[in-house]
Amino acid sequence: SFLGADPLSAAALRDMSGVVTYDPGFGSTAVCKSAITFIDGDKGILRYRGYPIEELALRAKFPAVAYLLIYGHLPSAREYADWRRKLTIHSYIHEDMLKFFEGFPPLAHPMAILSAMVASLSAYYPNFDEHEDVDLNIVRLIAQAKTIAAYSYKKSIGEPRIYPRTEFSYCANFLRMMFATPAVE
């Protein structure tokens, strides 16, 4: 059983007609089953793990939604506290990575900087592809993504970077690193 429109199998269409489908940009290609996300754009429906996005936007914070997407359930109070603690302590990037930011030209797009910097994380965590480190690497990536994104933006506008601080929430820290300046802090 499928949610949304009834699917047409491209393989069945090929078998019946001998014609293959061409879908530039996969604009009409759908994954028929997903335990993570359901989207019906025509009806304005977006669900994560069965929860309507409106409910999550009103009642859950970003770290809880990230936890839901990764682990399949909203965290208990204890799980949430532990998750937030891990995201906080892993939010700093290696100091040597700061040199990489200086190598980008002043007009480099922040997304180009961000993607290059995320790729460079594997150089600092050589065991990133080992199964026993999966949870730790998930935490590191989520925790450091906000720091790298903020530093990328600061680089693109020529402002000094702001380090993360442990007393702020994930989103408050991100906004602070994006828009604060050392002279005003």
Feature-to-residue mapping (PLM):
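Hydrophobic alpha-helical bundle cores within soluble ligand-binding/oligomerization subdomains
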Residues: 1-185
